[in-house]
Every structure is written in structure tokens, then in C-alpha cells.
Amino acid sequence: MAEKVLTRYTGKGAPTVTANRVIRASAAITTDGEYTDEIPVAGFERLTLTIDYAKNSETTWRLYMLHSPDEGVTWHWMLNVGAADSGGASAVVKAYDKFTPSDFAASDHVSIDIDVKAKQRVKFFVQAVGSGPFGLVGIGAQAGVSPVAI
């Protein structure tokens, strides 16, 4: 079965599609150091988020993710969740993942695979820690029905 792909990216101009099919684009984060996006993921099994980091940047970033089963339904935290209870709810261990300049020392980007089975919508936002200028950061997303090598 061919992989279904959904892409959503920030920035100006066309995104760069790498050989491993992760979508990346360069984008200037807004003056308040935040970016938010919402992605419909119904029918997909996993979501890969990729963050490109500005070279020589000293900014630390926090990535928050939430999911919602349907329109108008409460958003729930999604990163680093504990085991689901009988009602399907999960305990949040940590509400965000933090990326520091040292995380990007050996690579241009960091990718995160997230299980999105049975979820309808995913919302994520990236927040800079501290004051600007924040430089450039790229945020890419790909959803599919089977894992890909990254």
C-alpha cells in the first residue's frame, strides 16, 4: 500500500523535500518567538515533525503538542504521556520537549516521530525561550501510514 502523505510547512517559498521524504522549510519565527499550526491527521498512523535550527543560534526552543479527537473537543497534551487509563486518557509526564543549541550540533535538524493512531487533529506550537532576536527556524511535518527512515 502506498504511503499517504500530508504536508504542512512554514516559511516563504517552496519547501525542500529531502531524499528521506521529510519536508523542511526555513521560516522566520514571529517577533514574539512563537509559531502555531494545526494538522488534520485522521487516517494516518504517525506524524514526523522536523525542526531545522539556525546556525550559530543561542536560542532554546520548546515544542508543545496537543491532540483532539474531533472539532470542538478539548485539546489534550501529547508529548511524553504516560500509560492510558481505561477511558483512554493519558497522564502527562512533561508538557513539552526542549531543544537547545547543543541538540543541533551534529545535525542540521531534529526529527520526532509521534504515534497519531485514532487521533483526528494535532496542534503544535514552538516557543523560543528568552528574548529575541530569534533567527531562523524551520518547522516541517509529514504524516503517513507506515514508518520512514529519518
Question: Which residues does each PLM region occupy?
Answer:
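C-terminal interaction-tip segments
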Residues: 2-21, 29, 52-56, 67, ...
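Beta-sandwich interaction modules
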Residues: 34-42, 77-146
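Structural beta-strand segments of beta-rich domains
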Residues: 45-49
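Surface-exposed ligand/attachment interfaces on beta-rich extracellular proteins
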Residues: 15-40, 54-60, 70-73, 87-89, ...
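Short, surface-exposed beta-strand/strand-loop-strand elements in extracellular ectodomains
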Residues: 59-79, 137-139
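Hydrophobic transmembrane signal anchors and adjacent membrane-proximal interface regions, especially
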Residues: 3-9, 15-21, 25-27, 63, ...
